[in-house]
Amino acid sequence: FDAYCDHLLVRDAEGRLILADALTRASEEKPELVIDMATLTGAARVAVGPDLPALFARRDETAEALLRAGKINDDPCWRLPLHEAYGEWLKSDIADTNNAHANAFAGASVAALFLDKFVGKDIDWAHFDTFAWRPAGKPGRPKGGDALGLRAAWHMLRERFG
């Protein structure tokens, strides 16, 4: 939905505002790595379906470690780009940035670029945009809520930090 509120155009993307605040707060401690997971966009679900969370990462080595851990531990994920050129779509005439763009292109990547603005510049960051729901049961995976990407992240963290 679109609604005008105090001269700001707000799109149905309010959850990313809360996540942006959380990422800003997490960055204050200057951690080595931040990983967040959210049911951020329907665009990720459309792009990779219900079985794979979309993965965005600033650093290739972090993305590769998460992809490897996911593959080894039966929790595959799929990397999508943080394509900087799409950041143009977050420009605003009245604010520092928009939280959602007005076209239908690259919705998951643009949402991830929005979040990227709120993570400290020198911090390694990875973001899972996950559907978190299994529409049909599979062996060892019942129908319903599912923490897609969680095992991949946990195993990568254990490998990296012990």
Name each model-derived stretch.
Residues F1-G162:
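A generic structural signal for tightly packed, nonpolar segments enriched in small/aliphatic residues
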